[in-house]
UniProtKB/Swiss-Prot annotation:
Keywords per UniProt: Cell cycle, Cell division, Cyclin, Nucleus, Phosphoprotein
The UniProt record lists the keyword Cytoplasm: no
PTM annotation (Phosphoserine): residues: S21, S383
Gene name tied to this protein: Ccne2
Family according to the record: Belongs to the cyclin family. Cyclin E subfamily.
Xref: PROSITE patterns: CYCLINS (PS00292)
Assembly notes: Interacts with the CDK2 (in vivo) and CDK3 (in vitro) protein kinases to form a serine/threonine kinase holoenzyme complex. The cyclin subunit imparts substrate specificity to the complex.
Polar residues compositional bias, start-end: 7-28
Primary site of residence: nucleus
Protein name (database record): G1/S-specific cyclin-E2
UniProt subcellular location: Nucleus
GO terms of biological process kind: cell division; chromosome organization involved in meiotic cell cycle; DNA replication initiation; homologous chromosome pairing at meiosis; regulation of cell cycle; regulation of protein localization; telomere maintenance
UniProt modified residues of type N6-lactoyllysine: K348
Residues the record lists as Phosphothreonine modifications: T392
Amino acid sequence: MSRRSSRLQAKQHAQPNQPDSPQETQIIQAKKRKTAQDVKKRKEEITKKHQYEIRNCWPPVLSGGISPCIIIETPHKEIGTSDFSRFTNYRFKNLFINPSPLPDLSWACSQEVWQNMLQKENRYVHDKHFQVLHSDLEPQMRSILLDWLLEVCEVYTLHRETFYLAQDFFDRFMLTQKDVNKNMLQLIGITSLFIASKLEEIYAPKLQEFAYVTDGACSEVDILKMELNILKALKWELCPVTVISWLNLFLQVDAVKDVPKVLLPQYSQETFIQIAQLLDLCILAIDSLEFQYRILAAAALCHFTSIEVVKKASGLEWDDISECVDWMVPFVSVVKSVSPVKLKTFKKIPMEDRHNIQTHTNYLALLNEVNYVNIYRKGGQLSPVCNGGIMTPPKSTEKPPGKH
């Protein structure tokens, strides 16, 4: 037996149980009454607080400035659930209700890979309204800059993914800044491409080459300083799932038949570059930032295939992409009105990888055509492009009889 137990037993034998004295009983009862009164008093105070609200004591005319307030007594109000239906942009999105369209993978869980991609899509935010933050900029300035970056990518045989990473870095960086001078756009753009090339390219161009293509507008020191600014502003979040990555994935999911070959492109390179050209043109328009990259890629795929293919490859329904599909109609009309883009061959680039090299065409002229189509659409008319391409006279064999 422990020493403590021995002491307790000895104490109990030395002091036998005795009934409480009347004085001690009165003290205990008084304490109980006091405690009950305190609890009741606190409840009354809480109830009283709920019966008061703050009301502006000045007329509505003066409510624009700082207004004194008074506290008035009001009837008790039940706290009701607010209507959150108007806060659509801030609702929690349950990513787990989207089943993975990916096939079974030998190297990872397809559902986990899919959920990770969706989480990235929601974490890397872009917004077409970033131009509101920059009073000195106009929408076409972004288009001109991105068109120039496309040309630089083609000259240095950079991959499409490199361009789309640079585009994402630029748009997200501009969303973190305010009142950027238009003279800084080229520096921000070329620095974004510099960062993207180091991430994506095996043999990235040297720093002096990026400075060279700016024709003296940006020095190597300027690019290095801006690189650090961009990385800090983006908090080193440099791994978005780009538009072109989604397109690659969707075409692969639709075409793959054999699981062991899932990592090798199984789709048509010609189909890929046709859709990629459409996305190149779309991304020049600042309104494209209104849509998630996954939606843009799925809408472009829908224009060249069918909604059934989109459902199979992306897991998206028509309601998810219908708005983007409609927005993309003028772009599709313009792209299909010109000669189809052809696969190019590049030195030191394997044939199986040539479709991934970024190419450039006169995108600014095509974008002007898109603007024309939009003007006609708003006026309720169909432009010549929307009517099926550029209008040309019929062949002599197709003319009506008697009009030769």
